[in-house]
């Protein structure tokens, strides 16, 4: 029987067998070639370190109801993205064929039976590892579009994981003339500098908000992106942003 990676309790992962469902006319069967987790959000969920683990989500109000039980036994599949190869095609599927490389937001398991319209074809010549970055790139692009980066803007990015690094690069493509990156991890700051930021600050050794204000003639950043999910970073991002500026929070 095929296997999948699941969490049966906070912080504990196991391999579990499962039975694959019959193939419906609009579905395809996919054999996994490469899968990945989401380093930030998913690992916090794996550790039960998010409101999803303690407070019931109200889909109508779009908020967590504090103190109300989720009724969740915690059992959940792990994994965020998967690249695979189509091995079977339903009778009504015309968009895909056997041997196509496809990818989607899917958990870590050996096979997937899924509607064809939920899958995207993988471009030729693109590695599985690169395709896994489709997810953070999607969030980064959405953040930069929400921030409405314009030609000549001064931009600050707090949190230099994959999303933050891509936000900085997308902001430059959007016309930002000066970009400062903030993260306590040295190798992340160095990566930001290699990819085009003008300055990288360590918030554990400097007052990032104060320094950025001073570096911008006491004005601050026109647009600030907070991608780390840290309350301290969010506070620093607020202090960094200029009067009537824009702060985009992308973290969960």
What residues fall within each predicted segment?
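Glycine-rich cofactor phosphate-binding loops and adjacent beta1-alpha1 units
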Residues: 195-252
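A glycine-/small-residue-rich N-terminal strand-loop-strand element
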Residues: 72-105
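Short N-terminal strand-loop motif that marks the start
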Residues: 1-75
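A structural motif shared across PLP-dependent enzymes of the aminotransferase-like
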Residues: 77, 105-116
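Mid-domain Rossmann-like dinucleotide-binding core that forms the NAD(H)/NADP(H) cofactor-binding site
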Residues: 127-205, 210, 244
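Conserved acidic E/D residue at the C-terminus of a beta-strand in Rossmann-like folds
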Residues: 106, 183, 251
